[in-house]
């Protein structure tokens, strides 16, 4: 900004932004452990038959992860940008549409590409009241392109400070949580009371920019998030939507589960909030996380195919724009990609060969790294035969070399849930064995199990 008198800069306005922080190279560690595919009685034969009767079966805990509910929020109008003032006391003329995310001419062709659009700066240095976060978004865009994600050309969306309340989500979230104090909702009664207290607290509200980085399973979302957090050099916090991933992120700085922040009894602040597996959270939880951290930028990482818009609690009703996406998986190969496409998922597999095989539900098969099931009742059946297994909802975001999926006829209804199908069919790198009866398998590979879920967008969450 130049003075209108002699070309010298006003003494109160800095000419340059602060220098970028040099990236720090770090490596994340990951590993898988296989569950023993053995019976606890060596005298028993491998050919077994689970107890029958649908009356003994429960639906399990799967439905708890189908986050979706609430009416579509009204259109969000951008706030007025803070205008930096000149040394003469006159306000600098405000640019038209200050909230727009524009193309960065300096970065075009070098890092983020010509289609990447980042916010214009409102003046001031990093940490000042006028700083909108150009450096952070510049760096995130650069890493996204380097990691194989493609820009959608959409800008980040600005949400006004009062959006949580004005959208109606705050009222519905409080009402829903209050009505379930004695029913769970992934929180104990004491935890629910703490969350309600945080919702009603008089915290300073902050407008924020939000965008989503989405990708199919195995596209590198987690690796990208690690790089952003470790090499960015800015004040950021990572939130894990899946708490079971905490051990895998133990070496990542400023990384917490969503519940740890939702129950936090002190005030914290960060510039950038990075949320992993955001489809496992509700819209109200995401907005409360932003409120607690007072963050200016919120970036969601996840797979939209693993979400749902069936109820208002779904993050989809926040209408966060997808700014980068990837449809190519480095995890599984062509056979799995073909199976997923028949299920309605727009997946592209890697170049390596993998396999999807079918085996009878009753009988024996080679051991794999992990056995997964849809319902708690099926897990208990297998455990009686000495076979350990894990719920599909608990392995979202995880990866294994080989996987066995058990599907008894009683669990057929779970296959109509697109979210659960997407997770179950995409955890392996080299081999997926599906244990079910032949008729069900043919319906599965032919994509004949269409979703039967009915919209309930008049409700915040499941009853």
Swiss-Prot record:
Task: Please tell me where ATP binds in this chain.
Answer: 215-222
Q: What ranges does the record give for the region Nucleolar localization signal, renumbered to this chain?
A: 11-16, 37-52
| Compositionally biased intervals (Polar residues) | 23-49, 83-95
User: Is the Transport keyword given for this protein?
Assistant: yes
Q: List its EC numbers.
A: 3.6.4.-
Question: Which reaction is recorded as catalysed by this protein?
Answer: ATP + H2O = ADP + phosphate + H(+)
Q: Where is the (+)RNA virus helicase ATP-binding domain?
A: 185-326
Q: Where is the (+)RNA virus helicase C-terminal domain?
A: 327-463
Tell me which cofactor or cofactors this protein depends on.
Answer: Mg(2+)
Q: Which InterPro entries match?
A: (+)RNA_virus_helicase_core_dom (IPR027351), P-loop_NTPase (IPR027417)
Q: Which UniProt keywords apply?
A: ATP-binding, Host cell junction, Host cytoplasm, Host cytoskeleton, Host nucleus, Hydrolase, Nucleotide-binding, Transport, Viral movement protein
> In the UniProt entry, what is the domain comment?
The N-terminal 84 amino acids contain a nucleolar localization signal.
Q: What does this protein do?
A: Participates in the transport of viral genome to neighboring plant cells directly through plasmodesmata, without any budding. Multifunctional movement protein with RNA-binding, ATPase and helicase activities. Engages in homologous interactions leading to the formation of a ribonucleoprotein complex containing plus-sense viral RNAs (vRNPs). ATPase activity is probably required for vRNPs movement complex assembly. Intracellular delivery of TGBp1-containing vRNPs to plasmodesmata is facilitated by TGBp2 and TGBp3.
Self-association state and partner proteins as the record states: Homooligomer. TGB1-TGB3-TGB2 complex formation is enhanced by ATP hydrolysis. Interacts with the suppressor of RNA silencing (via N-terminus). Interacts (via N-terminus) with host importin IMPA1.
What is this protein identified as? Movement protein TGB1
Q: What is the lineage of its organism?
A: Viruses, Riboviria, Orthornavirae, Kitrinoviricota, Alsuviricetes
